[in-house]
Amino acid sequence: MMTHPGKKLNFMGNELAEYKEWDEKKALGWVLLKYPQHDSFHKYFSDLNHMILSHPALYQYDYYPEGFEWLVVDDNQQSVFAYARYAPDGEVLICIMNFVGNTHEGYKIPVPVAGTYKEIINTDTDCYTGSHFINKRAIKSKKVPAVHKENSIAVNIAPFSAMVFELKRN
């Protein structure tokens, strides 16, 4: 939910995927980084923070309705959610989350603006110890209605994953 509007809280140890609850009497478990699962999560958390700082759509309109729009909110069969984040300069990001263990190929996501969408982060990337079921190429929107929008993109969504797409205008 780091892409959802509002300020972010990273409490001590979150970035390491600590097993133990924080204890003010003990240091963080930096030794965990020698294990691939923890090291890859640390890399993901670093990449996620870099993405947030690099994209004004993820922070400039945090408390204004102009900065957020639900795109998929009621797909209770597939448990996929999607929303758009906007910046004053016209930047558009599409955030997609899959909360179940099903793979979705060609899942239609409504988009607010016609154009080409490039995946900029995906939790299923192999460098984060995922299965690498990602969207390797930019995806051009099609005039295929989905939910309440005239245009949509067809994306591949891995189980229990989250991804963000950036609009590259045509």
Residue ranges and their predicted role:
Residues M2-N10, N14-N170:
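Carbohydrate-interacting/catalytic domains
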